[in-house]
Amino acid sequence: MGKSVVILGAQWGDEGKGKIVDLLTDRVKYVVRYQGGHNAGHTLIINGEKTVLRLIPSGMLHPNVTCLIGNGVVVSPEALMKEMGELESRGIKVRERLLISEACPLILPYHVAMDHAREAALGKKAIGTTGRGIGPAYEDKVARRGLRVGDLFNKEAFAEKLKNILEYYNFQLVNYYKVEPVDYQKTLDDVMAIADVITGMVADITTILDTARKNGEHILFEGAQGTMLDIDHGTYPYVTSSNTTAGGVATGSGFGPRNLDYVLGIIKAYCTRVGGGPFTTELFDDVGAEIARKGNEFGAVTGRPRRCGWFDAVAIRRAIQLNSISGFCMTKLDVLDGFDEVKICVAYKMPNGEIVEYAPLAAKDWEGVEPIYETLPGWKENTFRITDVNKLPQNCINYIKRIEEVTGVPIDILSTGPDRVETMILRDPFAA
């Protein structure tokens, strides 16, 4: 009997989802992206070779897997072709194994221009977007003015729609933001040059998934970003523009929610965050700097340094509620090697003195929040590349067990290094 498994970030993104998707892809027929765009940065290291995938599902490195991009994903034709080219230069037959929903909104140059113009205008109050046009493309979708993949089939109608929407954007860019307009003809020519390649990969994603389920095939849904960046449930307004939680699978792919069997939440052994927004356990001392150094905490897409802090069980409890998480995969356990002590945030003290065990929603409600920590003995032994849980230091095992206790969710997979083989699967999501 086939299983449908969701892999998603349970923190603020950058948890190591790409490696785990790649690891579990050996078991599946389909890997599906259902939200986000090329603002994702899924880093895979296989046999020492590094690959960063931003838009194409991580399953593309497995020749027997078909990769699907669902309607909830915003697609940059330029970014897609660039990524396809990189993979095809390595002999990977992308066009034979990548299928795209015709309902995917397109990201075009005016979205990118608007993204940059807005962030520049906000100055120090900027959200900290990746500047790739993701937000403006989702805005167009909701406003029902956006161009979609399906529009590429009718080139004349596309050209007319593009002209109208570009007038709307250029008016704002020139008159309000005082920046250069986006050139209509160049935008049209660039898209038309690759339109046939993209339309050649269009398919009915919902029917493919439903048929696969009925045929007993394993399906893996690959989330991007993280739970606390969800447009509705994250630390608004410091969030991304899509639903990063498990509910996004149904809306972003057309796969019925009752058909999901297991939700795997990816967590780091500590916490990180990129860009602005609240981060209760953030460390500003030498410990935080050491975690960042050992964890190589720089964004795969932006290259920006990540903010680092202790494990936040309060935020994780909210993620468990939102996603109905079945089990965790803990990554970067080895980064905590060598510390005299490690800490887990088990509650927040609110400005009014109230003690809470679940994170607030809006960013403004995090102001003045203080972390309440449990301190555990650290471990000096090296856990890097250990693949037998019985060989982990006892204090490390105690740390893992305590996180399971304070969250109420089992840790089913442990990662002790960037390569796919540096992993311990304690309970297989496809066998659970």
UniProtKB/Swiss-Prot annotation:
Ligand binding (GTP): 13-19, 41-43, 306, 332-334, 415-417
Residues holding substrate: 300-306
Listed cofactors: Mg(2+)
Main localization category: cytoplasm
InterPro entries: Adenylosuccin_syn_GTP-bd, Adenylosuccin_syn_Lys_AS, Adenylosuccinate_synth_dom1, Adenylosuccinate_synth_dom2, Adenylosuccinate_synth_dom3, Adenylosuccinate_synthetase, P-loop_NTPase
Pfam name, any one: Adenylsucc_synt
Cofactor note: Binds 1 Mg(2+) ion per subunit.
Active site (record annotation): 14 (proton acceptor), 42 (proton donor)
Entry EC no(s): 6.3.4.4
Catalytic activity: IMP + L-aspartate + GTP = N(6)-(1,2-dicarboxyethyl)-AMP + GDP + phosphate + 2 H(+)
The keyword Cytoplasm appears for this protein: yes
GO biological process per UniProt: 'de novo' AMP biosynthetic process; IMP metabolic process
Family of this protein: Belongs to the adenylosuccinate synthetase family.
Protein name listed in UniProt: Adenylosuccinate synthetase
Organism (species): Haemophilus influenzae (strain 86-028NP)
